[in-house]
Amino acid sequence: MPIYKPSELRLFLNQLGIFPKKGLSQNFLIDGNIIRKIVRASDVQPGNLVLEIGPGPGSLTQAMLEVEAHVVAVEKDFVLARELKRFQTPSKQLEIFCEDILMFSVEEELQSRLRDDQKAKVIANLPYHLTTPILAEMVVRRKLFSSLTVMVQEEVARRMTALPGQSDYSSFTIFLNFYSKPRYGFTVSRNCFYPAPKVDSAIVVLELKEPPPNIDAQVFFKITRTAFEQRRKMLRASLKSLFDPSKISNALEIIGQNPQARPEVLSLEDFIKLYHELYSSERH
């Protein structure tokens, strides 16, 4: 039976000698309606290969198995990973790895389980302190994954899906848009977890896409990160450590932007145009 009540989950964890660890962001989802909404949002179909990051007690794992997905669950906590075996069947629909996801051989383990041009999906209740490194690791794997459906802090979800001109818009937003199409799914109240965290969470779905061509990503992201380190400054000031300010102003004019523009008003497409213009002038 799914563990949807705080009292049931507390008893389950106590029997295992587990006391939720703040350092591991162990806040477990206990709302069955939310679990089903996550499965629907991720559009998991029978036969899909799903990488589940941090399954915990396994309520979401069980919901995905019920729609006949093939789940590869990666759980760092040894006891919780061991207890997930209660969902295993002879069909090997569930495979469990007790590992840190950032040390897990994602390509090696998943590629061998995919058929032809099939792609896997990622579903994760991301540890709050590891949200950025895990997303950075997964979102670049377009050839392996079709989508990521992640639970993150609500304020992080706003940053992930912000539009130019909004206060939450950042270099992180641009990075995600470079590799995917992020979409805000829905808010998840802190009361849907045990123990309840201090803030609400949200579901974000990222549909992975081909990154823009003819761009050195490392150089491009150096520009966007540098620009947003001083987001209230004009680009010609915030990027002066990389380019001559007059060159930045000229490039902004050429791409149809105000020479006094700040980074928060430029879209991904605008930054791409700026990148090409700046490096085009470098070559001449």
Curated annotation (Swiss-Prot):
Keywords: Cytoplasm, Methyltransferase, RNA-binding, rRNA processing, S-adenosyl-L-methionine, Transferase. Transmembrane segments: none annotated. Its main location: cytoplasm. One of its GO terms (molecular function) is RNA binding. S-adenosyl-L-methionine binds at N27, L29, G54, E75, D100, N125. PROSITE patterns: RRNA_A_DIMETH (PS01131), SAM_RNA_A_N6_MT (PS51689). It is an enzyme of class 2 (transferase). Its EC number is 2.1.1.182. It is found in: Cytoplasm. It catalyses: adenosine(1518)/adenosine(1519) in 16S rRNA + 4 S-adenosyl-L-methionine = N(6)-dimethyladenosine(1518)/N(6)-dimethyladenosine(1519) in 16S rRNA + 4 S-adenosyl-L-homocysteine + 4 H(+). The keyword Transferase applies. GO terms for cellular component: cytosol. SMART domains: rADc. Gene3D superfamilies: Ribosomal RNA adenine dimethylase-like, domain 2 (1.10.8.100), Vaccinia Virus protein VP39 (3.40.50.150). HAMAP family: 16SrRNA_methyltr_A. PANTHER family: DIMETHYLADENOSINE TRANSFERASE (PTHR11727), DIMETHYLADENOSINE TRANSFERASE-RELATED (PTHR11727:SF7). Specifically dimethylates two adjacent adenosines (A1518 and A1519) in the loop of a conserved hairpin near the 3'-end of 16S rRNA in the 30S particle. May play a critical role in biogenesis of 30S subunits. Belongs to the class I-like SAM-binding methyltransferase superfamily. rRNA adenine N(6)-methyltransferase family. RsmA subfamily. This is Ribosomal RNA small subunit methyltransferase A. It comes from Protochlamydia amoebophila (strain UWE25). The lineage of its organism: Bacteria, Pseudomonadati, Chlamydiota, Chlamydiia, Parachlamydiales.
